[in-house]
Design a protein with these regions (language model features):
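Terminal leader/tail segments of proteins
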Residues: 1-119
Length: 119
């Protein structure tokens, strides 16, 4: 486990905007409680609460990855409109202590689904 610091900063802030996630016109998530995670030089990622996500459209997959700063990630596919978008969502169900704010949140790959921030 590594801790965020000057060489690899990670910040988590409440997003004041509404965040809507869709796939093929189907709303997967819609929230005013998203968290914006900024990590080093990577693009910002919106983490959406599970409670604001239509979990009935998601199917857990066997894929897992490990981040030395956040922990082990689990993945979901979106199943909507008869189509499956493989491993389009990840989540840290038991993140490392420095990242506990993202517990219970989902992140979405912007090249697989549409993520909109609405004022």
């Amino acid at each position: 486990m590594k801790l965020p610091g000057p060489d690899h900063p990670i910040t988590i802030t409440a997003n004041p905007k509404r965040v809507r996630v869709t796939a093929g016109g189907v709303v997967i998530a819609d929230t005013t409680h998203a968290l914006t995670l900024k990590e080093a030089s990577y693009p910002a990622v919106q983490y959406v609460p599970r409670g604001d996500t239509n979990m009935a459209l998601l199917a857990r997959t066997d894929r897992t990855t490990h981040c030395p700063y956040k922990g082990d990630a689990s993945y979901f596919s979106v199943v909507a409109d008869g189509k499956t978008i493989e491993n389009s969502i990840w989540t840290y169900e038991t993140p490392f202590p420095a990242m506990t704010e993202i517990t219970g949140h989902l992140a979405f790959y912007p090249d697989k689904v549409k993520i909109e921030e609405v004022a």
